């Protein structure tokens, strides 16, 4: 199964700047040129539509509030997902002309050039995430 997934990979790279209500995306084609950019609602339906448009693509996003569920969802849809460590992506967080579009573009370009520059992270499973939340809630109740 893994070999079949690897064969279906394309050189399409999607930078995805995650937001609470909307996500901004920037797509690089096989030649590394901008193919499309825009935004989509923070819904499974919109993410699934994007995934169907770029089967086998690599999607890169920074770790944040929505990255655990978004990354898992896109992986389930067959995309390769890279979650960048936001503390290590200097080119993005130190940029004077910061914008969602620019962040999405930089994520796509960095992933295309050398994904190790993003210092990729792996999120824990959904079950482990829920267990940690229960422990935090328990600790809060004990302190109260």
Report residues per predicted region.
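Phosphate- and other anionic-substrate recognition elements at nucleic-acid/protein interfaces
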Residues: 1-144
